[in-house]
Amino acid sequence: MVNDSCFLSGLVKVKTKFNNHDQTSWRPKSVYHYIQWKNSSPDFLVDISGFVDVKLKAIRAYKSQFFDSNNNEPETLISKKNFLNDVINRSADLGRLIGVDNAEGFTTNRVIGINYLNDIK
């Protein structure tokens, strides 16, 4: 649905309005999907080794969404006690695939190009 929407948004004959004003057609150059919990094969990995602490701090900013032994809300994937450990372990496992400490995986429907073979880890 996201890829179709991005394609359609670039068609001149598709007319849309926002706040009663016509929108100009525009299409993003690329669409990348972050791999969350599905065991998907990434199309590429990004080294996040220097940013894991920042990522965890950002996640913890939403602490009401996560495990709280005093909470009576229904359990979700992110409210499980081991959620943060899962995040750390997943990034470490993906990092292992490219020889770094931590990585995040992404998928895309397009072919990715690089300038130099040496840029590939």
Q: In which residue ranges do the predicted regions lie?
A:
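Metal-dependent de-N-acetylase/amidase catalytic core
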Residues: 1-121
